[in-house]
């Protein structure tokens, strides 16, 4: 197709199931802002959804995000909530959906100060105020 006939954004593909995904490993050296800048390119490829690795706060220095230490916060090292909102806006503008890998059964536990709820459960067991956070 000649460049002049090539759409600049894909039709709205945010409804329904993904028909094609493109996976991005968001990490500190390729944060949410950089990922957002891919939106028009991905739309031109004809995919329906961007698929990302976990975006929640992970162990300091994590390159993959599967060692979550705060299940309630977008990782500041990736751009935080501001970065997530920018990504969402860019994808919306390009008519793309978003699939985020979540890992409720994974946690980074190596550093007590990074995951105090887990360490409190280790110390206090079922009497911990965080016992219901985990399957113990």
Question: What feature does the model see in each segment?
Answer:
Residues 2-136:
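Acidic/aromatic-lined carbohydrate-recognition and catalytic surfaces
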């Amino acid at each position: 197709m000649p460049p002049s006939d090539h759409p600049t954004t894909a039709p709205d593909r945010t409804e329904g199931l993904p028909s094609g995904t493109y996976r991005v490993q968001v990490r500190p050296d390729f944060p949410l802002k950089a990922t957002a800048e891919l939106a028009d390119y991905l739309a031109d490829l004809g995919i329906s959804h961007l698929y990302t690795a976990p975006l929640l706060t992970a162990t300091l220095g994590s390159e993959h995000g599967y060692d979550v230490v705060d299940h309630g916060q977008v990782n500041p090292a990736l751009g935080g909530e501001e970065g997530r909102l920018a990504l969402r806006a860019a994808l919306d503008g390009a008519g793309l959906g978003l699939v985020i890998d979540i890992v409720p059964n994974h946690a980074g536990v190596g550093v007590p100060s990074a995951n105090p709820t887990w360490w409190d459960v280790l110390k206090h067991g079922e009497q911990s105020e965080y016992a219901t956070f985990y399957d113990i």
